[in-house]
């Protein structure tokens, strides 16, 4: 779709999703790692954002830009937008850079970090090449366990959630 010159282009996705909101508890929009029109549309359509952060040096620069964009969108376009949290991905606790990134993120965003981290594993890397989610590819893998744990944490963080709903 050519939205570049359309009035209200940042709300196009929001308008498309509106009829679906009553049918689903969650609608997940997986955005590209850029801050283009697709991501802007997703930020305008979303109620919460979950930021996956790879445990790599340049990811820290990217999160700063993303959070600046988040603040601008919240202020000007979508006042109901809420930062659900940041989840560390491709986590390898044996790697010094991973631990440095974790420390820096904990220092900068102490209240926004999920306890669950998504590990760097071969099984997580293999699953997409078979056209499967990690839960369908290997339910007993560390990656599956991590994503299930993250899902429970997400449910617990949502406004109005109760302990019983996460089980």
Region annotations inferred by a language model:
Residues 1-22, 77, 127-130:
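P-loop/Walker-type NTP enzyme "switch/lid" segment
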Residues 6-9, 59-62, 143:
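Short, conserved glycine- and acidic-residue-centered signature motifs
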Residues 12, 65, 146:
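Charged catalytic carboxylate motif
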Residues 104, 149, 154-167:
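P-loop NTP-binding site
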Residues 119, 125, 135:
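Nucleotide phosphate-binding site architecture
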Residues 128-149:
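C-terminal boundary of histidine-terminating zinc-finger modules
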């Amino acid at each position: 779709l050519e939205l570049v010159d359309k009035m209200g282009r940042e709300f196009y996705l929001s308008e498309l999703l509106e009829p679906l909101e009553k049918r689903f508890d969650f609608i997940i929009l997986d955005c590209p790692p850029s801050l283009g029109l697709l991501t802007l549309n997703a930020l305008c359509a979303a109620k919460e954002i979950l930021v996956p952060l790879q445990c790599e040096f340049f990811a820290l620069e990217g999160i700063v830009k993303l959070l600046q964009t988040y603040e601008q969108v919240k202020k000007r376009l979508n006042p109901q937008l809420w930062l659900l949290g940041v989840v560390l991905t491709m986590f390898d606790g044996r790697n010094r850079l991973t631990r440095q990134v974790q420390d820096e993120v904990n220092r900068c965003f102490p209240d926004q970090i999920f306890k669950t981290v998504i590990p760097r594993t071969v099984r997580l890397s293999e699953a997409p090449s078979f056209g499967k989610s990690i839960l369908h590819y290997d339910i007993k893998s560390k990656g599956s366990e991590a994503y299930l744990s993250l899902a429970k944490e997400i449910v617990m963080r949502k406004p109005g959630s109760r302990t019983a709903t996460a089980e």
